[in-house]
Design a protein with these regions (language model features):
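Conserved "HGTGT" condensation-loop signature of ketosynthase/thiolase-family condensing enzymes
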Residues: 3-189, 195, 200-202, 209-348
Length: 348
C-alpha cells in the first residue's frame, strides 16, 4: 500500500506541473506577441522606407527632367523671314502668309532671298546662308568650339554648313560627323551634358531642309533652317519636354499635364507654336491654344524641321514677351514631343 502511494504524484507535484504549464503558456504567448509586434514594426519601417525610396526616385526623375538648357544665340530662316523682327511679326499675325509658287507641278513656299531653284543646291545654299546670317546678326562675344554638335538634315548640307563656318567663324571648329538630331532624346542628352559642363561650354544645334514640291500634296513644300548655341545660361531656358506615343495608349492631356509639372507651371502658357497634328482637340479642352499660333500657312511642309522650327519660335516669343511659350511637334522617336520655353527670370 505504501509503495502504491509513493508511485502516485503528490498534490505538490501537480501544482508544480500546472505552474510550469501556465508559465510556459505565458512565455509562448509573450513570445508570439513580441514576434507580432516586431513584424508590425518591421512592416511599418519597410513601408516608410519604401515610401522614402519612391519619393527619392521621383525627386531624382524630376531633377533629371527639369535640368535646364539655356538658348544663348540663335537664328531662324524660312519663307517669311530671317530676323527676329520678322518672326515676331509672324507670331503677332501682322504679316500675311507668303504667296505659293508653282514648282514642278506642285505648290511651294520659298524664301525670296534665295535665287537657286534646284532642291539640293538650294539646301546647300540655305545651309551656307545660315552661317553667314548668324555671323552678321550675332553678338560680339568670344566663341569656342562646342562640346557637341547636333544636326537635322543631310550630310551634304552639313558639309556645306561646316565649310562655311570654317570660312566665316574660324574659331568654331566643327566635327566632320555631327550627332543626328533626335528630338526630345537629344534635348535630354544636351541637358545632361550641360549640367556637368563648365559654365562657358556650349552645344551647337542646327538643321536645314528644303522639301521638294509634289503634285497633289496636301501642304505646299516648304523650307527651314535653324541654328542655336545652347549653354547653361541664356536669355531663355527650356527643359527636355515630354513625349507622347499614340501606340502606348497614354492620353495626350496626361503628357501635357506632365509638361506643366516639369516646368512648375500651374496652367498652360498663353502661346504655343505648333503645326497641325491629329488629335490635338483634347489639348484645347484642357486650356492649350492650338489655333492662334499654328504655323502651317507660314511654312508649308518642312519635313523633319518642324520640331526645331517651333522650338525656335517659342524661344523668340519667350525672350521678347518675357512669358512662357509652348511648342509641339512630331518627334523622330515618338508620335509627338511637347515642351515649354521660359524667359530667364522664370527659370526653374
Amino acid at each position: 500500500v505504501y509503495k502504491r502511494q509513493a508511485l502516485l504524484p503528490s498534490s505538490e507535484g501537480k501544482s508544480a506541473l500546472a505552474a510550469t504549464g501556465i508559465l510556459l503558456a505565458l512565455v509562448l504567448a509573450g513570445t508570439g506577441w513580441l514576434i507580432r509586434l516586431l513584424y508590425y514594426r518591421m512592416s511599418v519601417h519597410n513601408a516608410r522606407f519604401y515610401d522614402q525610396l519612391v519619393a527619392y526616385e521621383q525627386q531624382q526623375w524630376w531633377a533629371e527632367h527639369r535640368q535646364p538648357i539655356g538658348l544663348q544665340e540663335g537664328l531662324l530662316l524660312g519663307p517669311m523671314g530671317k530676323t527676329t523682327t520678322d518672326w515676331l511679326r509672324v507670331l503677332s499675325r501682322h504679316q500675311r502668309p507668303p504667296e505659293e509658287e508653282n514648282e514642278g507641278g506642285g505648290r511651294a513656299l520659298r524664301a525670296p532671298y534665295l535665287s537657286v531653284s534646284e532642291a539640293i543646291a538650294r539646301e546647300k545654299r540655305l545651309a551656307e546662308l545660315l552661317v553667314m546670317e548668324w555671323q552678321r546678326q550675332r553678338s560680339e562675344r568670344t566663341l569656342t568650339p562646342p562640346l557637341r554638335c547636333y544636326w537635322q538634315g543631310t550630310e551634304l548640307a552639313w558639309q556645306a554648313f561646316r565649310a562655311q563656318m570654317t570660312l566665316t567663324v574660324a574659331q568654331m571648329t566643327l566635327p566632320s560627323r555631327p550627332d543626328a538630331w533626335r528630338g526630345e532624346a537629344s534635348l535630354a542628352e544636351i541637358a545632361h551634358a550641360l549640367a556637368e559642363a563648365d559654365p562657358h561650354d556650349t552645344v551647337l544645334i542646327a538643321g536645314c531642309q528644303v522639301v521638294v514640291a509634289q503634285p497633289g500634296a496636301v501642304q505646299p513644300a516648304g523650307e527651314s533652317a535653324v541654328l542655336w548655341l545652347a549653354g547653361r545660361d541664356g536669355p531663355v531656358h527650356l527643359t527636355r519636354g515630354e513625349t507622347y506615343c499614340a501606340e502606348k495608349g497614354e492620353a495626350l492631356t496626361a503628357v501635357a499635364a506632365r509638361v506643366l509639372e516639369q516646368n512648375e507651371l500651374s496652367g498652360p502658357p498663353e502661346a504655343c507654336a505648333l503645326f497641325f497634328q491629329p488629335g490635338l482637340e483634347a489639348l484645347a479642352h484642357s486650356g492649350w491654344d492650338i489655333n492662334l499660333y499654328r504655323q502651317d500657312a507660314c511654312w508649308g511642309d518642312i519635313g523633319e524641321m518642324e520640331g526645331l522650327t517651333v522650338l525656335s519660335l517659342a524661344a523668340i516669343y519667350a525672350a521678347h514677351y518675357q512669358q512662357p511659350c509652348g511648342w509641339l511637334a512630331r518627334d523622330p522617336l515618338n508620335t509627338l514631343a511637347i515642351g515649354i520655353v521660359k524667359p530667364d527670370g522664370q527659370r526653374q
